[in-house]
Design a protein with these regions (language model features):
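Short alpha-helical donor nucleotide-sugar binding micro-motif in glycosyltransferases
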Residues: 92, 158, 279-280, 287-292
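Conserved donor-binding/catalytic core segment of Leloir-type glycosyltransferases
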Residues: 212-228, 234-237
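Aromatic "clamp/platform" in nucleotide-sugar-dependent glycosyltransferases that forms part
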Residues: 300
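Conserved acidic donor-binding segment of nucleotide-sugar-dependent glycosyltransferases
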Residues: 333, 337-344, 353-359
Length: 396
């Protein structure tokens, strides 16, 4: 048991794009920060300035310090934060920080680590990134080299931490060799707030987004980036609508590939069967899950896949790529189907099994909901507290 089980902590969560986009790591950080604060801890976020957040502000009721930044091209709201060591040292002193939690290994993390080491503050590092998230658009010939460079950088980040956190066992198996020998670590799911996603109401969602409610609706939620392989899903649609004209695909999310994906849909003659919703509010995202019939994630790389958990919490059957670098495939167990990575014909076959069979959709949906109970975010927050307390026990 941790030495300080009742101590309320002062925690600095370092996440450069905090509040500036809706990626999984940002959503997870916001949720963890809010729940940690509700449990009595003092939490602050350190992130990058943006057009939306030029000054220090609050996100989910948590104080956020935003610093000078540089945007990452084609990143859809990802900015690199550049506070100075002096600035973070001052903030960490003023906030009496006990633990610095690195959520992303970006520029803000490097500076936060230097400030934390200067003050003797404990560091916990979280694994939220894969080379596939960064280098998939680079020429294939240089991707292995870039991956090795990235791993050496992660070794430096992880080597400065008292302990490491992985969202899944797969993430630990992929990344644990980048940490120090015998370094304490924990597997903590990003989790899901079951109460938040259990509402079956969709309000006027269908009307506002012009989606016909009588159709069988497929749903994708995520960034429109190469590693999400959304083109595979769009290419599967012609075969599906050939047999079921009442099938419709909803795509929630933004990214630099949107125009290319819209053009692909147009070239395939299926524009009327797809709605690109773009970025939506958290409330409308939940409405989208509940308005859908089948959730599809064709991603090539996922260290967990929070959107799959969200779909499961809404009681939806899931269809997921069997990609080697995707932990999301492990969510599929009598609640949906796997399909061969980037094989749009196989994806169409798996989707049609569910489009053709409403009772099977209902069965798989119920199983998804039951399985989602194993990922209650409140248990994840308790585990996160234990990781912090364990880090405080460690020696500098």
């Amino acid at each position: 048991m941790a030495k300080f089980p009742n101590k309320k902590l002062n925690i600095a969560m370092i996440c450069d794009p905090i509040g500036n986009n809706k990626s999984g790591v940002v959503v997870s950080t916001l949720r963890f920060g809010k729940l940690l604060k509700e449990r009595g801890h003092n939490v602050i976020f350190i992130g990058a300035r943006s057009k939306e957040h030029k000054e220090h502000t609050y996100h989910n009721g948590v104080k956020a310090y935003h610093y000078r930044s540089l945007p990452i091209p084609k990143s859809n709201g990802w900015n690199l934060a550049f506070p100075t060591v002096k600035e973070l040292t001052k903030i960490f002193k003023e906030e009496k920080i006990d633990v610095v939690h690195i959520l992303l290994p970006m520029s803000g993390a490097i500076i936060a680590i230097k400030a934390a080491k200067k003050l003797g503050i404990k560091i916990v590092a979280h694994s939220h990134s894969q080379p596939e998230n960064l280098f998939m658009e680079m020429p294939k010939i240089i991707q292995p080299t870039l991956g090795r460079i990235w791993n050496r950088y992660l070794m430096w980040i992880y080597g400065k931490a008292e302990s490491l956190i992985y969202p899944t066992e797969m993430a630990r198996s992929l990344l644990q060799n980048l940490g120090k020998k015998n370094q304490p670590s924990a597997v903590i799911s990003n989790g899901i707030d079951l109460k938040e996603f259990q509402s079956k109401s969709i309000g006027d969602f269908n009307e506002r987004f012009n989606v016909q409610k009588e159709k069988v609706k497929l749903l994708f939620v995520g960034r429109l980036f190469p590693e999400k392989s959304v083109d595979t899903l769009i290419k599967a649609l012609p075969e599906i609508v050939k047999k079921h004209q009442n099938t419709h695909l909803m795509i929630v999310g933004a990214g630099h590939l949107r125009q290319k994906l819209e053009k692909l849909a147009s070239n395939l003659g299926i524009t009327k069967h797809i709605t690109f919703l773009g970025l939506v509010s958290e409330e409308d995202k939940i409405h989208a899950y509940n308005a859908s019939d089948i959730f599809v994630l064709p991603s090539l790389a996922e260290l967990e896949g929070m959107v799959v958990l969200e779909a499961m919490a809404c009681g939806k059957p899931i269809i997921v790529s069997d990609a080697k670098m995707s932990a999301s495939r492990y969510f599929v167990n009598d609640n949906g189907f796997l399909f061969r990575t980037q094989d749009h014909e196989d994806l169409a076959r798996q989707i049609l099994k569910l489009v053709d069979d409403a009772p099977l959709r209902e069965k798989f949906g119920k199983n998804s909901f039951e399985k989602s109970k194993n990922y209650d975010i409140h248990r994840s927050v308790e585990s996160l507290e234990e990781a912090y307390y364990s880090a405080l026990k460690g020696k500098n």
